[in-house]
């Protein structure tokens, strides 16, 4: 669990929660309810997430210093997405990315760093990579390059 927490570190003062209403086995998008909680991310939240206990945990990748240790390209697809083709393309291009299946049947393409980097840099890199892979219109996390105030939380991404 500690390694998972380390690689998905982000904003500490808030997190996302998602309750899944329906899981479809045919690859269609899963409906759910998501919202931000302005509470610290606790060890219990991490543990429950890894045990599959709802709500699933969402982490805001941009931290209080506008830095990130990870970012994600969120490819929405509702059926028939070819994950193997995407992974083969990433491998061929020798990109340092990790791909997971999303709840919608699409993909989450993660980029991790060993040290915190400016949110603007990781966002620009992921937008560029998304375009190279043919997914230039996909959502990219972090969505912000900076938090505008102490009350700003940015957008969260549901963890795998």
Q: Language-model segments: what does each one mean?
A:
Residues 1-70, 79-88, 142, 155-156:
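DNA replication initiation on ssDNA origins
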Residues 14, 107-113:
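Broad hydrophobic/π-residue packing in well-ordered secondary structure
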Residues 24, 102, 151:
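Acidic surface patches and DE-rich sequence motifs
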Residues 54-87, 92, 113-160:
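DNA replication initiation modules
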Residues 96:
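Residue-level detector of anion-binding/catalytic polar loops
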Residues 99-108:
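Short, conserved phosphate-binding/catalytic loop or strand-edge motifs used
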């Amino acid at each position: 669990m500690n390694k998972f927490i380390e690689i998905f570190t982000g904003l500490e003062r808030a997190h996302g929660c998602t309750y899944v209403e329906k899981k479809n086995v045919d690859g269609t998008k899963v409906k759910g309810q998501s919202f931000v909680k302005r509470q610290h991310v606790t060890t219990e939240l991490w543990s429950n997430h890894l045990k599959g206990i709802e709500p699933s945990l969402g982490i805001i990748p941009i931290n209080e210093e506008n830095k990130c240790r990870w970012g994600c390209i969120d490819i929405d697809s509702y059926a028939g997405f070819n994950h193997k083709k995407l992974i083969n393309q990433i491998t061929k291009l020798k990109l340092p990315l990790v791909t997971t299946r999303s709840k919608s049947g699409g993909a989450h393409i993660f980029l991790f760093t060993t040290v915190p980097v400016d949110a603007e840099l990781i966002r620009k890199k992921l937008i560029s990579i998304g375009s190279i892979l043919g997914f230039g219109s996909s959502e990219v996390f972090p969505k912000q390059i900076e938090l505008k105030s102490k009350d700003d939380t940015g957008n969260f991404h549901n963890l795998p």
